[in-house]
Amino acid sequence: MAQKWQTISELAADTSRKVTHSPEEWCRFLTTAARFYKAYDFDDQLLIYAQKPDATACADMSTWNNKMRRWVNAGSTAIALIRKGYGGKPYLDYVHDVADTHPVRGGKDPWLWKLTEENREPVMERLRSAFGIDGAGDLGDLLMEVTDKLVQESYGEYLPDLLYEREDSFLEGLDDFNVEVLFRNTLRASVQYAVLSRCGLDVNRYLDTEDFREITNFNTTAALACLGTAVSQGSRELLLEIGDTIRKIEREKAKNPLAKSDREPYNDSRNFNTLKRERSDEY
């Protein structure tokens, strides 16, 4: 077990180096991480990306079996995550992606929200109200404004840790002011990318690789952890708000099916079961 833990620990370190190698590598990681904003922190997101970058919904075997009534496919490979037990002693926990499971009698699919033409405007109205943003007629522009505001308000909480942990990284040669500017800009672009990606928008309309050119400076595990944690927390706040709004809309649709938009046929039952899910079925 100790050897297995060491292998996964080394995988995490190797992946930290990999994702900071270039803007493209970092953005690929952000795409995966954005799908796991709710239940998994940065360290978990990194290991999920390392082992199954195309994963969409992960849970442990007990959750799949008992709550979702899904069995894990024979021969599938679990995703190992590092946990700390009594006295801080590390151990491994294992989760499986939904693609590696199959439903049995009474089986359920995890609820994964999706932005549509029907729910887009209510989501925008909710975001304007929740975050005090006026204007921004385009959803992408609104998300860019909201994330900018969130980062401006929160990056200072994480900056002291980064200033302390910058030793041996490329940040070490910079003064505090330039580290702050670099961190704020990279954090803002990263949260924006994660949120836009999870919302299914064309990220290239709003950001390009130049916005992530400084990611290579976070080239130690400790420095990247400071950035990654801030990205995870920042995107989580906004994505939870979006998910909650869409869930409420779908619950209302389930209660009043005849009130659906004419654009969506009433007899389209593809998502009927997911409309009945409780919040805890979201991944």
Task: Please report, for each region that a protein language model flagged, where it lies by residue.
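N-terminal accessory/interface modules of nucleic-acid-binding and processing proteins
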Residues: M1-Y283
